[in-house]
Amino acid sequence: DEAIRCTGTKDCYIPCRYITGCFNSRCINKSCKCYGCT
């Protein structure tokens, strides 16, 4: 599983939406954490 690099949470919205179908995500330690749909 490739880490998605980020400088801020907004960098994660599009890639996480692509992966999980939802924007719910955060940028932690310069990589994205995708939470999927809640």
Curated annotation (Swiss-Prot):
GO molecular function: ion channel inhibitor activity; toxin activity
Keyword Phosphoprotein: no
Cellular localisation: Secreted
Major localization class: secreted
Record's GO cellular component terms: extracellular region
InterPro entries, alphabetized: Scorpion_toxin-like_sf, Scorpion_toxinS_K_inh
Disulfide bond residue pairs: C6-C27, C12-C32, C16-C34, C22-C37
Pfam family, one: Toxin_2
Keywords (A to Z) from UniProt: Disulfide bond, Secreted, Toxin
SUPFAM superfamilies, per the entry: Scorpion toxin-like
Keyword Nucleotidyltransferase applies: no
Tissue expression profile of the protein: Expressed by the venom gland.
Family: Belongs to the short scorpion toxin superfamily. Potassium channel inhibitor family. Alpha-KTx 06 subfamily.
Further comment found in the protein's record: Negative results: is inactive on voltage-gated potassium channels.
Domain notes: Has the structural arrangement of an alpha-helix connected to a beta-sheet by disulfide bonds (CSalpha/beta).
Identification of the protein by name: Potassium channel toxin alpha-KTx 6.5
Organism: Pandinus imperator (Emperor scorpion)
